Curated annotation (Swiss-Prot):
Compositionally skewed regions (Polar residues) per UniProt: 29-43
Name of the protein described by the UniProt record: Cell division protein SepF
Keywords in alphabetical order: Cell cycle, Cell division, Cytoplasm, Septation
Skewed-composition ranges (Basic and acidic residues): 47-63
Main location: cytoplasm
Length: 218
């Protein structure tokens, strides 16, 4: 009996070892199963967070695009206000420019008219020679294309004839003309001036038939 009891104890001992090994195997398998489930849960939780991040990024991009569009293209109301504010300024500037152009054109026309009239005008100088040397001054006026009305009333007959001969010769050299217009007055004209004098009866004195001098004594 004692031997049998010892044999049964030995059998029961080995049976408990097998049970412990089985329990250890089951525990290890459960340990391996739990991390896998946790990994699957974690893996499933990450994809849920990624769409949220994508939505946030899309919102930021949309806002940034709207801001750039608003900066690039101003609102219609602001553009109309700017146009309305700039339009009166442009109108005033155009009016000022037109006024300046009109005044400048008028000034240019006046200058041109004055230049043309000055170039077309002919002056007539009235001279009262007192001596023979004054004849040279009269000829100088003829050289610059001026008409000279000569009155010999302050010269003696002999001096007047000498002065008249000198002026007549100079007028022929310069292609001018010398015409008698009064008893003691002669008109000396350049070549570009034509003189038309009507025939009139000039009273003659006993002094000379060709030269009717009515001279005064100095």
């Amino acid at each position: 009996m004692a031997f049998k009891d010892t044999f049964n104890k030995m059998i029961s001992y080995f049976d408990t070892d097998e049970v412990n090994e089985v329990e250890e195997d089951v525990a290890a398998s459960t340990d391996n199963v739990i991390p896998r489930s946790q990994q699957s849960v974690r893996a499933s939780s990450h994809p849920k967070q990624e769409p949220r991040n994508n939505h946030v990024q899309q919102d930021h991009q949309a806002r940034s695009q709207e801001q750039t569009r608003s900066q690039m293209h101003p609102k219609h109301g602001t553009s109309e206000r700017y146009y309305q504010q700039s339009q009166p300024k442009e109108g005033h500037e155009m009016v000022d420019r037109r006024k300046r152009m009109s005044t400048s054109s008028i000034a240019n026309r006046r200058e041109r008219y004055q230049q043309s009239t000055c170039s077309d005008q002919t002056t007539i100088a009235l001279k009262y020679p007192h001596k023979y040397e004054d004849a040279q001054e009269i000829v100088d006026l003829l050289i610059v294309n001026e008409c000279v009305l000569i009155d010999f009333q302050f010269m003696l007959d002999a001096q007047a004839r000498r002065c008249l001969d000198f002026i007549d010769g100079a007028s022929k050299v310069l292609y001018g003309s010398l015409q008698k217009v009064g008893s003691s007055m002669y008109l000396l004209a350049p070549s570009n001036v034509s003189v038309n004098i009507e025939e009139m009866t000039i009273p003659h004195t006993t002094q000379d038939i060709g030269f009717d001098f009515d001279m005064k004594r100095r």
